[in-house]
Design a protein with these regions (language model features):
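Soluble extramembrane regions of membrane proteins in the secretory/endomembrane system
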Residues: 1-11
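Selective detector of the "anchor" transmembrane alpha-helix that sits immediately C-terminal
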Residues: 13-42, 90
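Long, repeat-rich segments with strong aromatic
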Residues: 24, 51-58
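Generic detector of multi-pass transmembrane helix bundles and their immediately adjacent loops
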Residues: 38, 43, 55-169
Length: 169
């Protein structure tokens, strides 16, 4: 056995960093959502954005609901003041309901989908800004790397699927 062999990358004593994978998956999800939202007027593109956007909203909103539950109804140490609530927002469940209503109704995406997706992305970006402040020291790099690009991609896709209308005055 060589001295220091246990400290080599990949050994059982040194866990491999998964941060790159979280970032890659977040960028992939966000990129696909942004792309699919732009194709929402093109037949299958609408269905792709509805399915993928609804799935992302359900997953992120479900994670947010779980964190709110843990924060409100348990004494779990790590659930209290969990900044990841800005990343996995319970508002995702509301967005899921709006997406389901859009799927049933058909037609162009409602403005409420765009507005709520952008709101969720702004909260997510606010979580990044909070990390720069000395009062917030939670180690949540993995959550930031996954949720921020995915939430921004969802907002971009929703904005492309439901563009703001400019009415003449």
């Amino acid at each position: 056995v060589r001295p220091g062999a246990d400290d080599a990358p990949g050994s059982s004593r040194t866990p491999a960093s998964l941060l790159g994978w979280f970032l890659a998956f977040g960028v992939l999800v966000g990129g696909v959502l942004g792309w699919a939202g732009g194709r929402s007027g093109a037949g299958r593109g609408r269905g792709a954005f509805l399915v993928l956007g609804s799935l992302w909203s359900l997953v992120s909103g479900g994670a947010g609901f779980l964190m709110v539950y843990l924060w409100a109804f348990t004494d779990h140490t790590y659930a209290w003041r969990n900044e990841n609530l800005l990343q996995a927002s319970v508002l995702g469940l509301v967005l899921f309901a709006l997406m389901a209503g859009w799927a049933r109704r058909g037609g162009p995406a409602p403005a409420s989908v765009r507005a709520l997706a952008i709101t969720i992305a702004v909260f997510s970006a606010a979580g990044v800004v909070m990390q720069l402040l000395p009062w917030f020291s939670q180690v949540n790099g993995a959550a930031l790397l996954l949720f921020v690009p995915a939430n921004i991609g969802m907002a971009l896709g929703a904005a492309r699927a439901a563009p703001a209308t400019t009415e003449p005055t």
